[in-house]
């Protein structure tokens, strides 16, 4: 069955994308954020005040639209109660093209509590508080180093980002002519110490800039004994020093080394969504390259396997946006079902003429592909996982496999 939290997150993200694409002609789109502890009577009273103030708007059309939007919200609030996380109303005259507008209302129950009451009127909906809820809070500091190079980065949610790359002036182990071995070794140790200090300062600057309540700790990667020398030398800021979690052997110290470090730390990070999703994609690829026949991809193949109950795990890209349309002839029995990708605000695709009789074709049904596949999974007891595009395998799922793949219970030959 579909994991409720991941499916709800997918639907929440899709709803925000739709709202982001809506525009008004003037400042006539209202965003109303109501916290869970706010009294409905107080909200209605404040909206009445906003309605009265809107009478001062010079443009007659804008005034009518703003007051109409406020009336629409008040009619919905009158008998309502505020859900446990609060509620958000997005209402207004949305520009639909051809010099026309349409009064629309979207109601959102957020996944996290609304903190502050807010009434906002503009030419677009105010989405920042809801968009912030999509951001992953947990952040890990990443550092990979040897005596030649170091890279500092952050792992936030599922995204790895490099912030600093440093190179050293540490001389090689072979000394130049005329230098005593002792003197050369002293200079080399000084250069190593200075480089470690530069690394510690740069990494501390990056890590301290993170909201510390969301900062889980630091992972250090590199060859031995370099990473151990660095960690023992207390080169981090004292607040960061306390948050070093573990050291891992990695071969690369450039940006690719950050990904290698995250993979090496997979056991420590096993509860992180990124690692769960990586393991699922790796399982799919293992089945795909083996001769087990227990991997399939492409919407049609996946759907056929779902219907017969053969799918163990359905993997769907978080960024997949597709609809399945049923097209029928207005004169004969011709019918066709096709899927197509869409973006918020897209209109229906052209239908054309019937290939059998030449009559006009019309779209008789349109369903969201993800919703439809998830519904079949619920009926069949199939597990559904949504995969982000913030890592290589997740990006491959969308770009190379069309956003839908499945791990099968048995080989069906489909």
UniProtKB/Swiss-Prot annotation:
Which keywords describe this protein according to UniProt? Cytoplasm, Protein biosynthesis
- Output the superkingdom of the source species: Archaea
Q: Which SMART domains match?
A: eRF1_1
Molecular function (Gene Ontology), one example: translation release factor activity, codon specific
Q: Name one Pfam family in it.
A: eRF1_2
Q: Name the residues that span the membrane.
A: none
**Matching InterPro entries, A to Z?**
eFR1_2_sf, eRF1_1_Pelota, eRF1_1_sf, eRF1_2, eRF1_3, Peptide_chain-rel_aRF1, Peptide_chain-rel_eRF1/aRF1, Ribosomal_eL30-like_sf
State a GO cellular component annotated for this protein: cytoplasm
Location in the cell reads: Cytoplasm
Q: Which family does it belong to?
A: Belongs to the eukaryotic release factor 1 family.
What HAMAP family does this protein map onto?
A: Rel_fact_arch_1 (MF_00424)
Q: How does it assemble?
A: Heterodimer of two subunits, one of which binds GTP.
Report the function annotation for this chain: Directs the termination of nascent peptide synthesis (translation) in response to the termination codons UAA, UAG and UGA.
Q: What is the official name of this protein in its record?
A: Peptide chain release factor subunit 1
Native species: Methanococcoides burtonii (strain DSM 6242 / NBRC 107633 / OCM 468 / ACE-M)
């Amino acid at each position: 069955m579909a994991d409720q939290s991941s499916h709800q997150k997918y639907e929440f993200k899709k709803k925000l994308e739709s709202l982001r694409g809506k525009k008004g002609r003037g400042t006539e789109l209202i965003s109303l954020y109501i916290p869970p502890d706010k009294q409905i009577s107080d909200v209605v009273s404040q909206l009445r005040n906003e309605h009265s103030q809107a009478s001062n708007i010079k443009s007659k059309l804008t005034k009518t639209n703003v007051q109409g939007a406020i009336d629409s919200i008040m009619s919905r609030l009158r008998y309502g109660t505020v859900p446990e996380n609060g509620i958000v109303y997005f209402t207004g005259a949305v520009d639909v093209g051809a010099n026309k507008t349409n009064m629309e209302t979207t109601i959102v129950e957020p996944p996290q509590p609304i903190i502050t009451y807010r009434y906002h009127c503009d030419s677009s909906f105010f989405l920042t508080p809801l968009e912030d809820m999509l951001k992953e809070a947990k952040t890990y500091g990443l550092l990979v180093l040897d005596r030649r190079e170091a890279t500092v980065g952050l792992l936030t949610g599922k995204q790895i980002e490099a912030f600093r790359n440093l190179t050293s002036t540490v001389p090689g182990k072979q000394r130049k002519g005329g230098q005593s071995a002792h003197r050369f070794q002293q200079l080399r140790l000084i250069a190593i110490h200075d480089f470690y200090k530069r690394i510690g300062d740069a990494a501390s600057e990056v890590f301290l800039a993170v909201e510390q309540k969301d900062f889980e700790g630091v992972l250090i990667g590199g060859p031995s004994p370099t990473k151990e020398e660095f960690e023992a030398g207390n080169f981090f800021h004292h607040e960061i020093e306390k948050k070093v979690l573990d050291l891992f052997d990695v071969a690369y110290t450039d940006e690719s080394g950050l990904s290698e470090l995250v993979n090496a730390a997979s056991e420590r990070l096993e509860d992180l969504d990124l690692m769960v999703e990586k393991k699922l994609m790796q399982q799919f690829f293992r089945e795909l390259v083996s001769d087990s026949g227990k991997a399939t991809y492409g919407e049609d193949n996946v759907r056929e396997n779902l219907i017969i109950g053969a799918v163990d795990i359905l993997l769907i890209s978080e960024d997949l946006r597709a609809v399945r349309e049923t097209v029928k002839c207005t004169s004969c029995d011709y019918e066709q079902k096709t899927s197509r990708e869409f973006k918020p605000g897209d209109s229906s695709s052209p239908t054309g003429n019937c290939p059998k009789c030449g009559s006009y074709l019309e779209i008789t049904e349109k369903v969201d592909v993800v919703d439809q596949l998830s519904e079949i999974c619920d009926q069949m007891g199939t597990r559904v996982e949504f995969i982000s595009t913030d890592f290589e395998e997740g990006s491959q799922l969308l770009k190379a496999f069309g956003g839908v793949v499945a791990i099968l219970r048995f080989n069906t030959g489909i």
